[in-house]
Amino acid sequence: MAKQFKRKSNGVSENNRKRGRQELRKVTRTAARKQQDESHEDGLDVNNNFEEDNAEEEIDEEEVGEQDYDDRGKAYSALLTLLKSEHKEKSKNVTSGSLQVDRTNPSDSEDEEIAGANVEEDENEGEDENVDENGIDSESDNEDEDTVNRLSTDPFESHFNLPTEDYLAKEEKLVLKDNEKWCTVDKRTYSDLAVTSLVQLPPGEPINPPLLKSSKLNEYTIKKRVLDSYQQAYGAELTDLESTLINPILNYRDVNFQYKSFKNKSYRKLYTLHALNHIFKTRDRILKNTAKLHAAKEDSEELELRDQGFTRSKVLIMLPTRDSCYEVVEQLIKLSGTEQQENKKKFNDQFYVKAAPPANKPDDFRDAFKGNNSDFFCIGLKFTRKSLKLYSSFYSSDIILASPIGLSMILENPDKKKRQYDFLSSIEVLIVDRCNQIEMQNWDHVNTVMKYVNKVPKEFHDADFSRIRMWSINDQAKLLRQTLVFCEYLTPSINNLISSKSHNLSGKVKFKPIINSENSMMNSIGLKIKQIFQRFDSQSPLQDPDARYKYFINAILPSLLKTSSYEDGIMIFIPSYFDYLRVKNYLKTSTKFTFGSIDEYSSQSKLTKTRQEFASGKIKLLLYTERLHYFRRYEISGVKTLIMYGLPSNPLFYKELIRFIGKSVFKEECDLDLALVKILFSKWDAVNLEKMVGNERAPVLCNSMNELYEFR
């Protein structure tokens, strides 16, 4: 059997054991983590205790965050043994009343491993795919003939098997080398769904799959075993949103879909259905062609049938936590129709924890951090006719599910001889779900993974070159790879996955929620508080951070005490950690403000002390970062004036931050008419601005002559 991984312990200190994974997290983040030598409770640990002591309850202290990190040593220094060690399975300890993923002994805990990682090849794992004419699904009897009609009406065939070498060479030049502009060919508004769609096609001649749109799933070309399982679980009829979304997904177009709320989960059953449909069609195509080749060999005929990539893995699904992976795997099991799941108990032990954050946290927070919220996993799934194998070798897997950090640790091992990335060479469907959670963890790891997807392998792993498609051999797989991106709200980094990192010749479809003044976040605050939007000039997105900083220190800070009705209770919210460090340094060296600062890397003792001093008025001004708010969701006491250095990426945070002032008003610590919210923005903030004020107001604020706007 293929070996699994665990961390070696001989001769390695406890600090060194933890260092590799921890420093990988921080080395590409926006700034280096401060060294922390405090005890366990001083760390920002998402996975550990949510409970509070009595003193902290008075200021709404609930603990969620990232693990306490040790900064000493070189990045990755303790990870050199990962790719040659045995994996040791560990169970989780669940303590009633709080979320407890057992990390009390990092050297022994499976949480310090990449759960599911298995990159070694097993020669026996491919035996079930040998020629077996009886192994083809029963539904295939009606698909034996590759008629022109079938090839042209099945998106799988028209997308992956019909494009010619000449066509792909021509499109490669236009799309990748000349970088010609994509054309917008269709814009639609679905008023009943409060959604708009935008369709973009590549330059030249796009692949034209059959564009069927139906509310009945059985009218699409879906494998019978998947279709039957889906209809048994969810019925034959699709909702309006599902029928709108399933069309571009099944037609192998790239999709960027904003689901608006964590409660909207129906899209997940659609992409799992699509992933299984793709896997089973690929498998059946290979088995049929193998049977044809055997028959031709007996008749002394020569056939060229190309139906494979360099490696077996065809679908990659990136997710933020083990709990989210558990949910997707359960969905795959439900729709696959498999009668047996190998290693299911082991999977449940490593990926499932029945626990949740406290009930007084926001619902979206409870959803994000429920269950096993470790962001450290990478697991392969292999499907056969009647069974599913979990923890299959990556080179024998059909689907790989991974967190970006877990996958990047395999892709970029500091020892170049131990790096593994060939198993991503033949990915044909890439799915990135819950992108906003991943972005708050560390988006750099997504960029790392994207560098290796569809990269020509350094070794060929016994591949049969007579069966490999020419577009794989010619390094053109990226032109046919489908990318599906699902997020709650759009950010520039997430948008770039489709806009600049995807080159799918079938085109791209971007779905966008309609946000007007009525359903904008500003309209849901529930407080008649003065909100001033202040625009500053910025020549380009690259120059925007410098322009924002100069405007802040020259125009906002000098008049801060004059414009505020209160000399204390001033909070400055800063989304970017880079900007936070810059402003913090300026306040420390160039002003006489009595200020405090807390961020996602602050120790627990500092977080508690600073918040208490700010609430009591001892500290007049407080710097507060977006990632700290994401991981903790504090309700800061004592806020009377709120300055937003930039708009939060999550629109919910806008409402929560302003309600800090509402809390002070309720406690009669300030007057609602005297409280103030001021927001800095530039024309490059249009996407974020639209989420706050609506699509009618945002263009006015960005482009009109006035630079200052007041709302209540």
From Swiss-Prot:
GO annotation terms (biological process): maturation of SSU-rRNA from tricistronic rRNA transcript (SSU-rRNA, 5.8S rRNA, LSU-rRNA)
GO molecular function: rRNA binding; U3 snoRNA binding
Residue ranges the record marks as coiled coil: none
Keywords on record: Nucleus, Ribonucleoprotein, Ribosome biogenesis, rRNA processing
Presence of the UniProt keyword Cell membrane in the record: no
GO CC annotations, alphabetized: nucleolus; small-subunit processome
Annotated Basic and acidic residues bias: 15-26, 34-43
Protein name: U3 small nucleolar RNA-associated protein 25
Protein encoded by which gene: UTP25
